[in-house]
């Protein structure tokens, strides 16, 4: 790539870091950003900056929240005897859209993958174990491959 397109190549590289985004998709995204007005590009950059600065993990379930504790964990309407363990915060949004589950959640922030050097200590497993007490009667392990499609 010519020297003067290095910033574009860097942008492609950054987008390609996202799971599920290959070089082709990352290149499309980079060109979309380049086609934005300066104002739109700055809004995108600020949205990323604010999300990184203002959101953090709920101290109970590890989902992302602006407060110390997320709305689901604070809700008195949730069934506190059931915890659904999920891989990522995305999974919570997916389950919540079904309106079928009314328990609590716990986000592991990944899966054990010895080939990738990810063991139990890199995940939020000890936080899950700390939540298990006499009020928790059921733990559901959510697996994407077994989740029903909400349109069926």
Q: Locations of the language-model features?
A:
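Short, well-ordered alpha-helical scaffold segments within catalytic/effector domains
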Residues: 12, 55, 67, 122-129
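Cys/His-rich Zn2+-binding cysteine-cluster or related metal-binding knuckle/ribbon modules and their
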Residues: 2-9, 17, 27-83, 88-92
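Post-transcriptional modification and biogenesis factors for structured RNAs
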Residues: 2, 14, 130-134
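Short amphipathic alpha-helical interaction patches enriched in hydrophobic/aromatic residues
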Residues: 15, 33, 140-143
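Conserved small/polar residues in nucleotide/adenosyl-binding loops
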Residues: 144-152
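Extended interfacial segments that mediate partner engagement and assembly in macromolecular machines
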Residues: 26, 75-140
């Amino acid at each position: 790539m010519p020297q003067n397109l290095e910033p574009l190549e860097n942008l492609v590289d950054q987008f390609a870091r996202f799971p599920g985004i290959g070089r082709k998709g990352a290149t499309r995204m980079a060109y979309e950003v380049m086609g934005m007005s300066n104002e739109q590009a700055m809004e995108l950059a600020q949205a990323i900056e604010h999300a990184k600065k203002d959101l953090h993990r709920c101290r109970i379930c590890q989902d992302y929240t602006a407060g110390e504790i997320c709305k689901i964990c604070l809700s008195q309407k949730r069934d506190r005897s059931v915890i659904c363990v999920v891989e990522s915060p995305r999974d919570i949004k997916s389950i919540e859209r079904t309106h079928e589950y009314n328990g609590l959640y716990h986000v592991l922030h990944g899966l054990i993958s010895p080939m990738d050097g990810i063991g139990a200590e890199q995940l939020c497993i000890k936080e899950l174990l700390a939540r298990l007490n006499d009020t928790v009667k059921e733990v559901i392990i959510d697996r994407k491959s077994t989740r029903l499609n909400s349109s069926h």
